[in-house]
A protein has these predicted regions:
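Conserved ATP-binding N-box helix of the HATPase_c
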Residues: 75-99
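C-terminal beta-strand of the catalytic ATP-binding
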Residues: 161-165
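DHp/HisKA dimerization-phosphotransfer hairpin of two-component histidine kinases
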Residues: 1-62
Length: 165
């Protein structure tokens, strides 16, 4: 699997409390959600969290980044953490051997797409005690000024995250 850029592999089950953290960025970064704060770049952080998800799940995560890399500010850190949660959900629940993460920086902002080829799911059927989609993805992105679209069906799921410039 991809090794996190920081060289640290989180132990399974070491996720911080999702309810903790600032209203703008969500959880306080911990061993499993740091992104690549050492390099401080969007692309570095995305590659790091993809490696973390691989280490936690043994599912291959295939990140692709396009455009000019950017510094990792608060809203982009929230985007990276939402992408991590989307990739973790796909790796955990889709039944797929691999998940694709595509990130593109454009003049209008940053788009990240997390795709799997699993059986899909209905967001309405997610139990209220499950916080991944509702809080770790949707609420985190909205608090940081971005938006989320989830398209899911029998041929797979795509989580689209957008953070405007």
């Amino acid at each position: 699997p991809l090794a996190p850029a920081s060289g640290d592999s989180p132990a399974p089950g070491t996720h911080p409390d999702p309810a903790a953290g600032s209203p703008a960025t969500g959880p306080v970064p911990g061993p499993a959600t740091t992104g690549d704060v050492a390099s401080g770049t969007l692309f570095g952080a995305l590659h790091t969290v993809c490696g973390e998800v691989e280490d936690l799940t043994d599912v291959t995560i295939r990140p692709v980044t396009v455009g000019t890399d950017r510094g990792l500010d608060g809203p982009l850190h929230a985007l990276v953490l939402a992408a991590r949660e989307a990739a973790l959900n796909a790796a955990t629940h889709s039944g797929c051997a691999e998940v694709h993460v595509f990130a593109e920086v454009t003049p209008s902002g940053v788009d990240v797409f997390v795709r799997d080829r699993g059986p899909g799911f209905s967001e309405a059927d997610v139990p209220p005690d499950r916080h991944g989609v509702r809080h770790s993805i949707r609420d985190r992105m909205v608090r940081a000024g971005g938006d989320v679209r989830i398209d899911s069906g029998p041929r797979g799921t795509e989580v689209s995250l957008h953070m405007p410039s």
